[in-house]
């Protein structure tokens, strides 16, 4: 009708005259000024998981002897806010973890809301940009890949021991020789080394570096699986490392922590542990095929006990959308496999080493890419206790719905 046409024209004119436009995309709801200088994206995310028998990877004999757990878990209830201000190259991002899951005997504070990421990026030049704030240090892909962009329900057994996780600091980063066979990315940073939201307890800092070669001249995004169906073969080969002196022997989203058998940070001296760690990494994607691999070495010097320990970790995983070969195979379904290995000091006697292995098979059904998917995986987990000279094993089943709005 004439009235409807008038109403539509008036509404269109009002939208065109508005200084702010609204939309929805891969980063959630977006508000943006028409000059492009200001932008805010808001996204909500949640994971709902069922695990049997373990909620986390078993590491000690006692875990294998008590394999009776069966649990539903709300994971990573997150709010993400990011965008840019003043200029498109002045970017910001922060992320809130609204309700971390906790054990029944844990303090309620452990499940309270917390800011896990906050950072500002100055990206005027591709060859040199600066990031400052708190984020997951860009050391390796498995940890750097978002938990919402994983190929399995959770990261491998390697992650807990070798991640440097979130730190507070500053980093210089950039991309050189874009589009050539020498295409590469570099990262060099200085951090407190005490984990998330923590001041430095000494004059020492955590120093890290990463060099990534995009050997086919194309950059590979930090996300797992090839649900995007990469048309041209794309891969990267990287080496990275860090050194730190302080009370921490491991890190997580909760901050500074300790490896099994090592002093907890609350009782350790400020400069008790010197850590040197290196990683080699490979990643590749092509037409539904994805491959990712890492090899880690970690050296821990205990200045109080006068001991040196070294840890080794390795994993390789691959996935494929078989619809690309067999038309009758469902297009949204990806099948995946992973092997992981860890060698670490025995908790009771650090001069003797335990070995753990993970054999996992997984399947992903993508309703809307990584933004809405169901993941199922089955793992066979083993422990060779070097002190008692015994071998233990158990199977684990997990299923998870991961959704972002």
Residue ranges and their predicted role:
Residues 1-47, 54-61, 179-183, 221-222, ...:
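N-terminal periplasmic/intermembrane-space "pro-region" immediately following the signal or transit peptide
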Residues 29-33, 44-46, 74, 79-83, ...:
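Residues on the lipid-exposed face of transmembrane beta-strands in outer-membrane beta-barrel proteins
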Residues 15, 20-21, 55, 65, ...:
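Outer-membrane beta-barrel pore domains
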Residues 25, 38, 68-77, 111-116, ...:
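Residues that define the transmembrane beta-barrel architecture of outer-membrane proteins
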Residues 58-67, 101-114, 125-212, 218-230, ...:
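Surface-exposed coil loops of outer-membrane beta-barrel proteins
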Residues 43-49, 93-97, 133-135, 187-191, ...:
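Transmembrane beta-strands of outer-membrane beta-barrel proteins
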Residues 8-22, 50-129, 140-145, 150, ...:
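Surface-exposed loop and membrane-interface regions of Gram-negative outer-membrane beta-barrel proteins
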Residues 31-40, 55, 86-90, 127, ...:
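Short loop/turn motifs that connect adjacent beta-strands in outer-membrane beta-barrel proteins
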